């Protein structure tokens, strides 16, 4: 009996121990878009000290409490602090002001900054014509982060903003998950390089390979080896052995996995000593998917159908959950109502291309061919339609995932 999606995922994730990932410390500039492997706490306050949010003058709020346009308060300017300079140590800050630039430390004894444009500047003095509330335009030490407070969370993707935050608190290295070494083999005598300018009758360009390379890199993998083989089991076996000798732990293949005359991958994997965990899942697209373990090489094999859309579905709904489990990541589901009624094959869980409407509903594209690529670019989400129904009425909540 063909496996349900949930049963197949359970079998897949049961083998995640075959792909142990180490934690490694990597220089900050090499961690972009990788996943943090540990929770991090702030090693210091941010800002590190009280500093000025404006170009202006530091003074005491009580010295200008009685200021008015008719009776401005005149304060001598006794110094200047630029960003990066040490503030002057004043014997008595009463009744005086100190010029400060944005980001400069606040001299001791002052509790407010008044902007340059809000004073009248005189020779070596300023005139203030309105009371200023204490604390105005002062960034307090630790108001953004306190030492020891949470900084970045385990599993967080290290975006440019995350790297900025880590740099601001002096982190030169970050703990990230090691990259899983993956080998990628596409198959098919009819498949030619994607850059080939012209095609002969019957040929197709290898569109799945660049997709998988980019997707694997985004998922934190090292694409260690890449190859394409024609419909030749012996050549396929030789390349697979070569990849394993290079330390590949996850072998990802596309094509030759269904029931046709040229679908040699299942038998070739068996001859290589792989143990098939499942072959075929009750889904559309992607039904012929095969998952196996390679005991001699301490690795796993995910053999995907060759149709491009089937490849994207198996990458999203099998490859991604496997890699997330390696890093103990959890994904929160999102459910939205259908914008229109949908008919689907009963008995198959369908992953169909869709878009969100302005009303926050999900519209399922009527074009769901597993070879149709344009709608992939035009879609924004996958709509997950359950196996046990052939008709879902408009308004029915369904789970959706971003493409």
From Swiss-Prot:
It catalyses: adenylyl-molybdopterin + molybdate = Mo-molybdopterin + AMP + H(+). InterPro entries: MoaB/Mog-like_dom_sf, MoaB/Mog_dom, MoCF_biosynth_CS, MoeA-like, MoeA_C_domain_IV, MoeA_C_domain_IV_sf, MoeA_linker/N, MoeA_linker/N_sf. SUPFAM superfamilies: MoeA C-terminal domain-like, MoeA N-terminal region -like, Molybdenum cofactor biosynthesis proteins. Binds 1 Mg(2+) ion per subunit. Pathway: Cofactor biosynthesis; molybdopterin biosynthesis. Keywords: Magnesium, Metal-binding, Molybdenum, Molybdenum cofactor biosynthesis, Transferase. Its EC number is 2.10.1.1. GO terms for molecular function: metal ion binding; molybdopterin molybdotransferase activity. The keyword NAD does not apply. GO terms for cellular component: cytosol. The keyword Transferase applies. Its cofactor is Mg(2+). It is an enzyme of class 2 (transferase). It holds the Pfam family MoeA_N. It comes from the Bacteria. Belongs to the MoeA family. Catalyzes the insertion of molybdate into adenylated molybdopterin with the concomitant release of AMP. PANTHER family: GEPHYRIN (PTHR10192:SF5), MOLYBDOPTERIN BIOSYNTHESIS PROTEIN (PTHR10192). This is Molybdopterin molybdenumtransferase. It comes from Synechococcus elongatus (strain ATCC 33912 / PCC 7942 / FACHB-805) (Anacystis nidulans R2).
């Amino acid at each position: 009996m063909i496996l349900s999606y949930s049963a197949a995922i359970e079998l897949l994730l049961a083998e995640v121990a075959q792909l142990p990932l180490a934690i490694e410390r990597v220089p900050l500039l090499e961690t972009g878009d990788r996943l943090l492997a540990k929770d991090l706490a702030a090693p210091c306050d941010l800002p590190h000290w009280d500093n000025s949010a404006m170009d202006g003058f530091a003074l005491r709020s009580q010295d200008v409490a009685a200021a008015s346009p008719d009776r401005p308060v005149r304060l001598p300017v006794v110094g200047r602090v630029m960003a990066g300079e040490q503030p002057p140590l004043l014997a008595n800050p009463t009744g005086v002001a100190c010029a400060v630039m944005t980001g400069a430390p606040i001299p001791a004894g002052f509790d407010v900054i008044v902007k340059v444009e809000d004073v009248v500047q005189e020779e070596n003095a300023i005139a203030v014509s309105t009371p200023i509330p204490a604390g105005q335009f002062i960034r307090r030490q630790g108001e953004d982060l306190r030492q020891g407070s949470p900084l970045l969370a385990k599993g967080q993707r290290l975006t440019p903003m995350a790297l900025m935050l880590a740099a601001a608190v002096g982190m030169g290295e970050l703990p990230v998950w090691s990259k899983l070494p993956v080998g990628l083999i596409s198959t098919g005598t009819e498949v030619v390089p994607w850059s080939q300018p012209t095609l002969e009758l019957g040929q197709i360009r290898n569109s799945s390979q660049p997709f998988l390379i980019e997707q694997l890199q985004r998922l934190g993998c090292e694409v260690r080896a890449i190859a394409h083989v024609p419909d030749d089991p012996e050549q396929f076996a030789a390349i697979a052995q070569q990849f394993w000798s290079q330390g590949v732990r996850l072998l990802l293949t596309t094509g030759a996995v269904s029931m046709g005359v040229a679908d040699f991958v299942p038998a070739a994997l068996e001859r290589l000593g792989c143990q098939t965990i499942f072959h075929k899942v009750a889904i559309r697209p992607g039904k012929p998917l095969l998952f196996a373990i390679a005991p001699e090489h301490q690795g796993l094999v995910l053999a995907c159908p060759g149709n491009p859309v089937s490849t994207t579905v198996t990458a999203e709904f099998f490859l991604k959950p496997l890699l997330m489990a390696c890093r103990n990541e959890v994904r929160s589901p999102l459910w939205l109502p259908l914008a229109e009624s949908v008919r689907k094959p009963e008995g198959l869980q369908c992953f169909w291309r869709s878009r969100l409407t302005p009303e926050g509903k999900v519209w399922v594209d009527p074009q769901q061919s597993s070879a149709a690529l344009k709608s992939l670019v035009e879609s924004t989400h996958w709509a997950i339609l359950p196996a046990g129904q052939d008709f879902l009425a408009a308004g029915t909540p369904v789970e959706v995932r971003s493409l």
